Design a protein with these regions (language model features):
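Short amphipathic beta-strand/extended segments with alternating polar/hydrophobic composition
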Residues: 5, 42-49, 59-64, 167-174, ...
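Beta-strand/loop-rich accessory regions of lumenal/periplasmic or secreted enzymes
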Residues: 137, 189-595
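Hydrophobic, ordered structural segments
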Residues: 73-94, 161-176, 265-269, 274
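A short, sequence-level motif marking secondary-structure junctions
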Residues: 46-52, 62-68, 172-177, 203, ...
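Short, structured motif recognition centered on aromatic/hydrophobic residues
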Residues: 12-17, 73-74, 79, 111, ...
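Post-signal-peptide, soluble extracytosolic/periplasmic N-terminal scaffold domains
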Residues: 26, 33-40, 53-56, 94-218
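Short, low-complexity cationic-aromatic patches
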Residues: 7-12, 67-73, 147-153, 162, ...
Length: 595
């Protein structure tokens, strides 16, 4: 038996206990040592040793790790002894809550209770967004810069959907009252998660749709997977009522290969009325056979190459701290919260410039997205998804997998938002925070002198949202040189169109690829764009900022000499939204500075 404090210790298996706790467990056979990683804690411990190394510092163990029949055992107090030792300083207790902290689960529930008690509230009402109603901007900056408390009650914005009618309310959580209740005219509400379920049920139980499926060789509607899509705006030319709550449904066949996206049921669109809970119209084109070639994407048909482990270690702990929802790294401080529509919102971003805390950005987030497709055919012409506004990209946050979606040294943050019933829902691993090496920051070698090089470090805030077939990855990247970058991209699966052509030598290939590219037998990837828009409320050294355009130009040389051309910069101020509406050109520069 093993004893602790004079009595027999209760031992539990190390692997199972630590993995259930959420820690990564690694065994070094050469060093005969365990490495345990959990959030900001990096622990090394040898079997039989009376000490462990936690973030580079020694910690006495009341009970050592014991090996028995080839398995490691630890005391049932091991997790508390090691991970609650205080040696991991990544997470700090927030003594003064930031005024932009997300609504807690309790606050979300309180907002729903208050709203449901209103006489205007209808039983069938659903919730599209419940979020913080932001206090006065000047007061928030005063808190961030001087620590001045914000003298305002916590307030919530509640957006609801009563049938097809959108309602916006503002709720005082402290005094438990509704400050405003505003029906929004001429607006469509977001597509909610239960709408997906409703559409699938409507399709599965429709005898009319089942008959149409037979034209495509499908006799079992239960194998049809639906994707509910917004109908777009065509000013009545599509024969649809713009004020109705409608979705267009394109379908795919589940063939059992785990990738129904590769099996589109082409030229078949069902128009579903969400209020009437029925199909009101079926739009068809020429029948195209469903591509049936198995195309799994989970690796079942591949032999992955054997690779040796790649480990990222921080043996002395993190270089950043997280206090509540505020993150501090080197000279940067910023607040982070998750919004159900736009995802992460970074606020009160400051940079410590030799002891002076300088304002950089009050708030930054994704503003919206649009994904327009360029194919005019019946199943494609209406596709121009507003992923953020129509579907809620924060709601569709994809939990991040450490070691795959983010490096193994990442800290994963859970976030809480409201679902369509108003119930608080926690998304595990919603945001990843990690530091990485990013090459040389500076290098110069002067002849006859020693080399001068400095390392570049970056702090990354990563978030992933899965909207249908696409998985969007967004990185906010903080550089130690005072730069903030945004990297946006997509992975997932291409949205494809079923066609007759198997190769580009087939008779129909030219027409089949008019609006896309043949990427597999009978499958075309249609031409489309992903356009990201970001909302950046920059306050560089204050709110009196000016946006300046700097356009490089080649001009004739008028200064004399043999050179015929020069490179100059045309600089001008952008002082209106009309001037700001410009075509994207990566060769131009936009400078925002304090004036």
């Amino acid at each position: 038996p093993v004893f602790a404090h004079g009595s027999e210790a209760h031992m539990v298996p190390l692997d199972k206990t630590l993995q259930e706790f959420g820690a990564d467990v690694q065994w070094d056979d050469y060093a005969q040592m365990f490495t345990l990683i959990k959030d900001g804690a990096y622990v090394k411990v040898k079997p039989g040793a009376k000490t462990a190394i936690v973030n580079g510092k020694s910690l006495d163990l009341p009970v050592p790790v014991v090996m028995k029949e080839g398995k490691a055992w630890v005391s049932d107090t091991f997790i508390n002894d090691v991970f609650q030792s205080g040696l991991d300083q990544t997470f700090q207790v927030e003594k003064r809550p930031h005024p932009l902290n997300s609504l807690s689960a309790a606050e979300i529930s309180e907002a729903v209770t208050i709203v449901k008690a209103a006489p205007e509230f209808q039983p069938n009402t659903r919730f599209t967004e419940i979020s913080l109603h932001e206090p006065d901007k000047a007061a928030v900056w005063a808190f961030a810069l001087q620590g001045t408390p914000v003298d305002a009650p916590r307030t919530a914005d509640v957006v609801m959907l009563d049938g097809k009618h959108v309602i916006e309310a503002v709720v005082d959580l402290q005094n438990k009252k509704i400050l405003s209740w505003t029906p929004i005219k001429g607006a469509h509400g977001m597509v909610l998660l239960d709408d997906f379920v409703s559409v699938q049920n409507i399709i599965n139980t429709s005898s009319e749709f089942a008959e149409v499926l037979k034209k495509h060789g499908i006799t079992d509607p239960g194998k049809v997977v639906t994707t509910p899509l917004t109908v777009g705006f065509f000013d009545g030319k599509d024969g649809l009522q713009q004020d109705a709550r409608l979705l267009k449904v394109v379908s795919y066949l589940d063939t059992g290969d785990g990738n129904y996206w590769a099996h589109p049921i082409e030229n078949l669109v069902a128009v579903v009325d969400l209020e009437a809970k029925k199909i009101i119209k079926i739009e068809e084109g020429p029948v195209i056979p469903v591509p049936m070639e198995p195309r799994p994407y989970d690796g079942r048909d591949r032999n992955a190459p054997a690779v040796k482990p790649l480990e990222i270690t921080e043996p002395e702990g993190k270089n950043y701290t997280i206090t509540g929802d505020t993150i501090h790294w080197q000279n940067w401080d910023f607040h982070l919260r998750l919004n159900s529509r736009v995802g992460p919102i970074l606020s009160t971003v400051t940079y410590n410039d030799n002891g002076t805390k300088r304002q950089v950005m009050y708030e930054g987030s994704l503003g919206g997205m649009i994904v327009p497709y360029g194919d005019p055919d019946v199943g494609w012409y209406f596709k121009a998804y507003l992923d953020s506004g129509d579907y809620g990209m924060g709601t569709l946050t994809s939990p991040i997998v450490r070691g795959k979606d983010a490096p193994s040294n990442a800290v994963l943050l859970d976030e809480t938002i409201a679902d369509y019933t108003g119930k608080p829902t926690t998304i595990p691993g919603a945001v990843a925070i990690f530091e990485r090496y990013a090459g040389p920051e500076y290098k110069h070698l002067e002849m006859g002198k020693p080399n001068v090089s400095t390392e570049r470090r970056e702090l990354v805030v990563r978030w992933i949202s899965t909207v249908g077939n696409y998985d969007y990855i967004f990185d906010w990247v903080f550089h130690d040189n005072g730069t903030i970058g945004i990297d946006a991209g997509a992975t997932g699966i291409e949205a494809v169109k079923g066609v007759l052509a198997k190769t580009m030598h087939d008779p129909s290939a030219k027409e089949d690829t008019r609006y896309g590219t043949l990427i597999d037998h009978n499958i075309v990837g249609t031409t489309h764009q992903h356009i990201y828009n970001f909302r950046l409320d920059l306050d560089v050294d204050g709110e009196n900022n000016t946006l300046v355009a700097m356009d490089p130009e080649v001009k004739p040389n008028t200064a004399g000499g043999p050179r015929t051309s020069t490179m100059q910069v045309n600089q001008y101020t952008i002082d209106s939204e009309q001037k700001a509406a410009q075509k994207f050109d990566p060769g131009t520069i936009r400078l925002l500075s304090n004036t």
